[in-house]
Amino acid sequence: MLRLTAGRVRSLLAGRATAAFSTSSARMASHDLEVAESVDMSKPLYWDRLDTPLPDRPYKEDLTAADKSLKQKEKGPWGQLSKEEKIALYRLMFCQTYSEMKQPSSEWKTVFGGIFIFLGFTGLVVWWQALYVYPPRPRTFDDEWKAKQLKRMLDMRVNPIEGFSAKWDYEKGQWK
């Protein structure tokens, strides 16, 4: 019994040692600095929102040489700027215009597609259950059986005063 326990302990330690030294281990992968990039939430972030028209910071913070020269031209009179330069300055500050933000998304198509896929799969499951899981319909549901049952109830004169048999004309053999 001692040998069996010692063998188990050795295999357990060997498994842990290989997991600790292998690079494919999940524990070792979590020590890599490239797993997740941390974002400093104390600094202002950029958001395109209709309810807050001016974000806390500009859309582009890292400016190229052309962008820097355009920012220098911005400090001068705006009448000297061309339309393209004004649009470029706007795009440095904001990612989207109001009309772009108000434009409806196509997300409803994905939602409806998911709903229809779910309904289709549910229909297939119900159809499969009707074929292979549920028992056959009882014979009492057949129209022939219901007609025989009706004839038997009329022959027995069930509820003759105000009910079923009161509406049957026994002399003519038809409903009143």
Swiss-Prot record:
| Alphabetical list of InterPro entries matching this protein | Cyt_c_oxidase_su4, Cyt_c_oxidase_su4_fam, Cyt_c_oxidase_su4_sf
| Annotated transmembrane regions | 107-132
- Where does this one sit in the cell? Mitochondrion inner membrane
Might you report a single GO cellular component term?
Answer: mitochondrial inner membrane
Keywords for this protein = Membrane, Mitochondrion, Mitochondrion inner membrane, Transit peptide, Transmembrane, Transmembrane helix
Give the Mitochondrial intermembrane compartment stretches of this protein: 133-176
Signal peptide residue numbers: none
Q: Where is the transit peptide?
A: 1-28
Main location (coarse class): mitochondrion
**Pathway(s) where this gene product acts:** Energy metabolism; oxidative phosphorylation
Pfam families from the UniProt entry: COX4
* Topology class, membrane: Single-pass membrane protein
UniProt GO BP: mitochondrial electron transport, cytochrome c to oxygen
Mitochondrial matrix membrane side: 29-106
Q: How does it assemble?
A: Component of the cytochrome c oxidase (complex IV, CIV), a multisubunit enzyme composed of 14 subunits. The complex is composed of a catalytic core of 3 subunits MT-CO1, MT-CO2 and MT-CO3, encoded in the mitochondrial DNA, and 11 supernumerary subunits COX4I, COX5A, COX5B, COX6A, COX6B, COX6C, COX7A, COX7B, COX7C, COX8 and NDUFA4, which are encoded in the nuclear genome.
User: Member of which family?
Assistant: Belongs to the cytochrome c oxidase IV family.
Task of the protein: Component of the cytochrome c oxidase, the last enzyme in the mitochondrial electron transport chain which drives oxidative phosphorylation. The respiratory chain contains 3 multisubunit complexes succinate dehydrogenase (complex II, CII), ubiquinol-cytochrome c oxidoreductase (cytochrome b-c1 complex, complex III, CIII) and cytochrome c oxidase (complex IV, CIV), that cooperate to transfer electrons derived from NADH and succinate to molecular oxygen, creating an electrochemical gradient over the inner membrane that drives transmembrane transport and the ATP synthase.
Can you say what this protein is called?
Cytochrome c oxidase subunit 4 isoform 2, mitochondrial
